[in-house]
A protein has these predicted regions:
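Cytoplasmic helix-loop-helix junction between adjacent transmembrane helices
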Residues: 120-157
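Helix-breaking motifs and short loop linkers at transmembrane-helix boundaries and internal kinks
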Residues: 57, 89, 110-116, 127, ...
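C-terminal transmembrane helical hairpin of 12-TM major facilitator-type secondary transporters
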Residues: 327-377
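Cytoplasmic membrane-interface "Motif A"-like loop-to-helix N-cap segments
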Residues: 86-98, 324-337
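Extracytoplasmic gate region of multi-pass secondary transporters
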Residues: 45-46, 252-320, 371, 375
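Glycine-rich segments within core transmembrane alpha-helices of 12-TM secondary carriers
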Residues: 152-174, 196-197, 395-405
């Protein structure tokens, strides 16, 4: 008797099982790395109103400068770091980055003055350089384009959840004043949030795989499908690019692309709003006592700081699911920018703490709704070394806002005595992001000549 021939595995079932494993095995760990990354980066915002600014005699402008100078170090090594990741592999490079910044973050425990704080923030930026774009690039090397928006949404959930969990946690740690080795509460907080970076960074060496072919947790059919899907996408993108431009190196391709620079400008506006809230929201909430006559404990201020970010996490996920289900459109990006730009200037004119937090919540939801969808765009028209350079360049230009936002906001607060002017600047930059994204959408429709064009694929063709 002849033996029955085994039928090939159903491709739909293989695709589902592969993406399920990636969503369970890979994405949560990278999201955990991002959670710790954002917590260490913004821990200074929790320390500032809870003893650090007083102990170090910092003005609002000095605090803003120390917060923002992180991004100067970050920017200087951003592109080289991401090119190194492309060369050495994500497992080694992301692990190295994480352990490095964890060691630097520990040193904040013993900072003694403004100068030391600024120097450490700069070095922390150098140590962290390349992590975020490297993580984005790493996920793009694992996840086909049709699944990328949802995957990046799961990854990006770590950022608002960092504040949801991290702000109350920081309050609890700061309340341990003098309990551990006589350290002030804010110093102990710096110590406690730095250690996980070192531990998880070491674990990353063993948990991550550089590419699907090395993943022991994927079956042979799953590896075959995933490698074929990613290779087909890469070949299609390279063929399209080959027909429109002469072959160039990765850096030249990225730096010579008008689309990369336009997306960099869009990202700048979002990041300006993101880090203004990240670094100054705890201080703004601390000012409710003077503004509204309210009194909150350190832990209660942490809980209030977390309030805008829980709805933001929900909106982020639902907005990205909508984009995945119905196709990513330009308005998935420019509409949140428009809403955020119109809402944030009104926040500090509200007549109560509840109203102020409610308006800030709208702005936070707008910022986080757009970001995961935004990061699906660069890898639609860049591959290989050009993708590494392009993602890093966009993140670098955007992170100029990471320096300018806290410094300008702090300087304006010192000058005017409040944060109103700083919020108007946030609104202006976010409205500019909306306008640029609308311009890209119109260009896409004009170039395609098709009714209803202007999806992101047409924008970037």
């Amino acid at each position: 008797m002849s033996q029955p021939v085994a039928s090939p595995p159903d491709q739909t079932a293989v695709e589902k099982s592969t993406m399920r494993k990636i969503s369970i095995r890979l994405v949560p760990f990278v999201a955990l790395m991002f959670f710790i990354n954002y917590l260490d980066r913004t821990a200074i915002s929790f320390a500032a109103p809870n003893g650090m600014n007083t102990d170090l005699a910092l003005s609002a402008a000095q605090f803003g400068f120390a917060s923002g100078v992180f991004f100067i170090g970050y920017i200087l090594l951003e592109v080289p770091s991401n090119m190194a990741l492309h060369r050495f592999g994500a497992r080694r490079w992301l692990s190295r980055i994480m352990v490095s910044w964890g060691i630097v973050a520990l040193l904040f425990t013993w900072v003694g003055n403004f100068e030391q704080l600024a120097i450490l923030r700069f070095i922390l930026g150098v140590a962290e350089a390349g992590f975020f774009p490297g993580a984005i690039l790493f996920l793009s090397l694992w996840v086909p384009a049709k699944h990328r928006s949802k995957t990046l949404a799961l990854f990006y959930l770590a950022q608002p959840l960092t504040t949801v969990i991290g702000a109350p946690l920081a309050g609890l740690l700061i309340n341990q004043h003098g309990v551990f080795f006589g350290l002030e509460g804010w110093r102990f907080m710096f110590l406690a949030v730095a250690v996980p970076a070192i531990v998880v960074g070491i674990l990353a060496w063993f948990v991550l795989s550089d590419n699907p072919a090395e993943a022991r947790w994927l079956s042979t059919p799953e590896k075959t499908w995933l490698i074929a899907a990613l290779s087909a996408e890469r070949a299609a993108t390279e063929a399209k690019n080959a027909g429109t431009r002469k072959p160039r190196g990765g850096l030249r391709t990225a730096f010579g692309s008008g689309r990369v620079w336009a997306l960099s400008a869009v990202y700048f506006g979002f990041i300006y709003g993101l880090y203004t809230l990240a670094f100054f929201l705890p201080t703004i909430i601390g000012g409710f006592e003077e503004q509204f006559g309210t009194t909150f404990s350190v832990f209660e201020r942490g809980l209030i700081t977390a309030i805008p970010y829980l709805p933001a996490a929900v909106v982020l996920y639902l907005w990205s699911r909508h984009a995945t289900a119905h196709g990513l459109k330009p308005w998935h990006i420019w509409l949140p920018a428009l809403i955020g730009g119109l809402s944030i200037p009104l926040a500090l004119s509200a007549g109560s703490p509840a109203a102020t937090v409610a308006v800030i919540t709208v702005t936070a939801c707008a910022i986080f709704a757009a970001l995961p969808n935004f990061w699906t765009l660069p890898t639609q028209f860049l591959t290989g070394a050009a993708a590494a350079a392009g993602v890093a360049l966009i993140n670098t230009v955007g992170n100029l806002a990471g320096f300018s936002a806290p410094y300008i906001t702090g300087a304006l607060a010192d000058w005017t005595g409040n944060y109103h002017a700083g919020m108007w600047v946030v609104g202006a930059f976010m409205l500019a992001s909306a306008a640029i994204m609308l311009g890209l959408a119109r260009r896409g429709r004009a170039d395609s000549g098709l009714p209803g064009a202007g999806t992101t694929s047409k924008i970037l063709d």
